[in-house]
């Protein structure tokens, strides 16, 4: 007994030991690798053994991945691995016969590529030549996967039902792809299974209902003959979905036919006989039935034993409980019998493209592809203020799937498109001034990161001025004369149209001459400035520079004229600071044309000079001649001599002057009698330097070709004026509410809105420079820092820092110290041409 147990234990031990040894050998030994290496060695011996003996080690290419390959060296004695190395076939190739690596003399970029002429084939690029390889039958080469893949069962087949042959059963039901010849059974089909192909290329394996067989010719499920071996008159318990409530199936001559109950009777499917009753009497609530007077998409549903409700569906079906119900999706209604595919298209004034696809089968949605149509330019601003008025999608449908939208898969319907500017402080609408060219869109969606979007935008613009028009129709690109109540072009502000009849016709065309400019805030569109000579006109022909020239300045050196603010203020200051003793002057200083630079193109010459006190009274009855040679001349009693008729050295106390219009129409003055002898006068005090009003600088701040602000810099060429300016600037009067705007005093007529309904303006009141609070603010701004309503700084000469306001020429402004380094011999005056100069 004991010896038997020992033998059993020993046997078990041997079995376990043998199993372990076998498994160790099995896992260590790779039969496939052994076979490959044996074949490699045999092939090498066949080719070289006649010339030289078999070497101890042989190498071969054991693995290839694109341009990278692995060379495995093995011992010829036991086929064990000697070593492995990885190489790039673009640098070196392995010569099998010579068993060595050699430099390449033919660069191969793709070792494997598809054969464009036959999808079943692919091409291998060898070191010397190309080799064409074939995939198994019913397989095609897929370059993306670099392998042969099964041909889809619905490839090149329209939507519908197809019989299942042996190959389809193997691949779709048994899920096995066999490389065998199916031609011998190509006309044999499964009796109930069939292949359903959808419009999008998808497929499904379906089966006919019980008692039905798939007919390969009609591609429909047909009911099996149920009356075989049954007597005539036999009533079948078979109720097709289209059988009415008063119909039943009965056998006649071995075939089933549809029979109807007598009038006013229904067929009770429980009693299997015709009865005179309501269809709901025996079936109750929830029972469904159909009659001959309703459509194929309707049925009746019992509410109780006596009443029923007509139900209307997209598609009527019968469920597993043999009750009718609604199915289908309303989106499939437009397809024939609710089956097929519908490609969605988007089209607007600018572009068209496919946006998706709907695939339906029997009113059921098989697939619904909706590509991302969000506008790629939705939140993009160009040059910080322009939007492209175009709905360019993120994706389009290419026939199989959604792909990124490009200039190649989107159809452009027009050569131009509309551009809108964001709302601005002056309500300037620029959509009629310029349009975008389609080439702009093509470059913007090219995904070339090296391109600057703003530069592309500026490069591809069509301007109204290019067509010699005031405006362009944003939709058609054609020149227009009206667009609303008025029309103007900010890129060419020399003219504008005032329109009537809601923009249907032109009331009048304005051509702005000297002293006039486009005022976009005025109903008349006209502003007045005597100095303006279309200085903001854009002279660039380069379209990119035109749109980039948004804010710029024009500086003009010109003459001070009689009506200038420079002349008015400087004359007032001169009179105030040059008050003399009356006994030393015969007339007070008057401002006249001698004091200013004469206007250009007007030359005035004095033909003669005359005595100011020698004028002829208007009411004189007798006019004495200026020179009478027969008049008795007075004698000099002291030396008994006669005085000359004209003595150029004679002294007089008259003031000499020249009339502004010359002396051609003025008679010479009569000779004044010699003055009575007077005591020698006291010495005269030193007269002040003469008032000279000569030059001024004009600075125009332009928004494209529209002037917004004007800064006048009046040159002071008189010590009295310079000293007066210095005294005025050192004694500025500021209202308490305008303390934060006290530095407006550097520039007269400068305005700042400081919030809380307070507007401050600098002025000269004839006595001092004041910064006064306006009774009602001239302008109220939403953004105090920019003094505008859109966050854009238009006034380049008004500066805001830490809630403090300063007016100062840009070149004199020190932002770090918030200081204006005003020039002592200059007076500055600011005009808000758009908001303050409305005519």
UniProtKB/Swiss-Prot annotation:
Residues 224-282 form the Chitin-binding type-2 domain. Residues 1-23 form the signal peptide. This is Capsid-associated protein Vp91. Changing residue 740 to L: In strain: T3. Keywords: Chitin-binding, Disulfide bond, Glycoprotein, Metal-binding, Repeat, Signal, Virion, Zinc, Zinc-finger. Disulfide bonds join 208-221, 261-274. Changing residue 331 to K: In strain: T3. Probable capsid-associated protein. GO terms for cellular component: extracellular region; virion component. Changing residue 638 to R: In strain: T3. A zinc finger (C2HC BV-type) spans 148-197. Residues 624-644, 659-690 are annotated as: Disordered. Pfam families: Baculo_VP91_N (PF08475), CBM_14 (PF01607). Residues 667-678 have a biased composition (Pro residues). Glycans are attached at residues 211, 306, 337, 613, 619, 639. GO terms for molecular function: chitin binding; zinc ion binding. InterPro entries: BaculoV_Vp91_N, Chitin-bd_dom, Chitin-bd_dom_sf. SUPFAM superfamilies: Invertebrate chitin-binding proteins. It is found in: Virion. Its main location: virion.
């Amino acid at each position: 007994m004991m010896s038997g147990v020992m033998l059993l234990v020993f046997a078990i031990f041997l079995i376990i030991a043998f199993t372990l040894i076998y498994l160790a050998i099995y896992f260590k030994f790779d039969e496939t690798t052994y076979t490959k290496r044996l074949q490699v060695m045999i092939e090498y011996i066949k080719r070289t053994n006649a010339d030289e003996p078999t070497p101890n080690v042989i190498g071969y290419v054991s693995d290839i991945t694109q341009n990278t390959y692995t060379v495995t060296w093995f011992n010829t004695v036991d086929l064990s691995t000697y070593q492995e190395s990885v190489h790039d076939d673009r640098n070196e190739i392995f010569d099998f016969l010579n068993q060595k690596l050699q430099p390449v003399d033919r660069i191969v970029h793709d070792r494997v590529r598809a054969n464009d002429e036959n999808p079943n084939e692919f091409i291998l690029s060898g070191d010397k030549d190309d080799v064409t390889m074939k995939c198994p039958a019913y397989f095609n080469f897929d370059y993306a996967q670099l392998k042969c893949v099964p041909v889809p069962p619905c490839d090149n087949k329209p939507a519908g039902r197809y019989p299942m042959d042996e190959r389809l059963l193997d691949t779709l039901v048994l899920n096995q792809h066999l490389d065998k010849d199916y031609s011998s059974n190509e006309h044999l089909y499964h009796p109930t299974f069939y292949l359903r192909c959808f419009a999008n290329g998808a497929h499904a394996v379906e089966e006919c209902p019980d008692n039905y067989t798939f007919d390969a010719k009609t591609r429909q499920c047909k009911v099996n003959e149920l009356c075989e071996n049954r007597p005539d008159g036999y009533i079948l318990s078979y109720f097709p979905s289209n059988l009415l409530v008063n119909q039943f199936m009965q056998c006649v001559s071995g075939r089933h036919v549809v029979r109807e109950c007598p009038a006013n009777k229904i067929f009770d499917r429980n009693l299997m006989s015709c009865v005179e009753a309501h269809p709901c009497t025996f079936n109750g609530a929830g029972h469904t039935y159909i009659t001959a007077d309703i459509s194929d998409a309707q049925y009746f549903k019992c509410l109780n034993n006596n009443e029923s409700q007509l139900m209307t569906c997209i598609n009527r079906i019968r469920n597993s409980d043999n009750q009718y119900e609604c199915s289908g999706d309303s989106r499939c209604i437009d397809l024939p019998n609710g089956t097929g595919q519908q490609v969605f298209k988007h089209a607007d004034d600018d572009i068209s493209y496919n946006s998706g696809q709907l695939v339906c089968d029997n009113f059921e949605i098989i697939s619904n592809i909706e590509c991302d149509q969000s506008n790629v330019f939705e939140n993009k601003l160009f040059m910080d203020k322009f939007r492209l008025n175009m709905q360019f999608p993120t994706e389009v449908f290419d026939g199989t799937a959604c792909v990124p939208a490009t200039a190649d898969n989107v159809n452009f319907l027009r050569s131009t498109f509309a551009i809108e500017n964001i709302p601005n402080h002056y309500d300037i609408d620029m959509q009629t001034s310029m349009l975008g060219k389609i080439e702009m869109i093509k470059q913007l969606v090219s995904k070339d990161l090296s391109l600057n979007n703003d530069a592309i935008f500026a490069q591809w613009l069509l301007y109204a001025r290019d067509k010699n028009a005031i405006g362009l129709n944003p939709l058609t690109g054609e020149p227009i004369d009206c667009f609303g109540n008025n029309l103007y072009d900010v890129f060419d502000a020399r003219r504008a149209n005032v329109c009537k009849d809601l923009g249907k016709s032109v009331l009048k065309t304005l051509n702005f001459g000297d002293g006039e400019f486009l005022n976009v805030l005025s109903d008349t569109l006209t502003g007045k400035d005597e100095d303006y000579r279309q200085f903001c006109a854009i002279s660039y022909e380069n379209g990119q520079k035109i749109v980039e020239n948004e804010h710029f300045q024009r500086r003009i050196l010109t003459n001070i004229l009689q009506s200038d603010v420079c002349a008015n203020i400087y004359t007032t200051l001169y009179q105030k600071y040059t008050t003399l003793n009356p006994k030393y002057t015969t007339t007070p200083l008057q401002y006249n044309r001698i004091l200013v630079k004469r206007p250009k193109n007007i030359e005035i010459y004095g033909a003669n000079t005359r005595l100011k006190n020698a004028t002829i009274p208007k009411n004189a009855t007798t006019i004495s001649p200026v020179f009478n040679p027969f008049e008795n001349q007075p004698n000099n009693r002291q030396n008994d001599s006669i005085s000359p008729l004209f003595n150029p050295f004679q002294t007089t106390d008259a003031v000499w002057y020249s009339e502004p219009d010359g002396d051609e129409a003025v008679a010479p003055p009569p000779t004044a009698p010699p003055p009575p002898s007077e005591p020698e006068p006291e010495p005269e005090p030193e007269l002040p330097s003469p008032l000279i009003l000569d030059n001024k600088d004009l600075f125009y701040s332009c928004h494209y070709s529209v002037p917004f602000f004007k800064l006048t810099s009046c040159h002071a060429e008189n010590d009295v004026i310079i000293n007066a300016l210095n005294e005025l600037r050192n004694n500025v009067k500021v209202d308490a509410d305008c303390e934060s705007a006290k530095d407006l005093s550097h520039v007269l007529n400068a305005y700042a809105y400081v919030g809380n309904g307070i507007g401050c303006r600098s002025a000269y009141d004839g006595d001092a420079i004041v910064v006064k609070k306006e009774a009602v603010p001239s302008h109220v701004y939403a953004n105090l820092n920019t003094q505008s309503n859109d966050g854009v700084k238009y006034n380049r000469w008004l500066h805001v820092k830490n809630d403090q306001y300063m007016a100062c020429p840009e070149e004199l402004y020190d932002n770090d110290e918030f200081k204006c380094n005003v020039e002592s011999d200059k007076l500055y005056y600011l005009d808000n041409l758009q908001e303050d100069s409305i005519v």
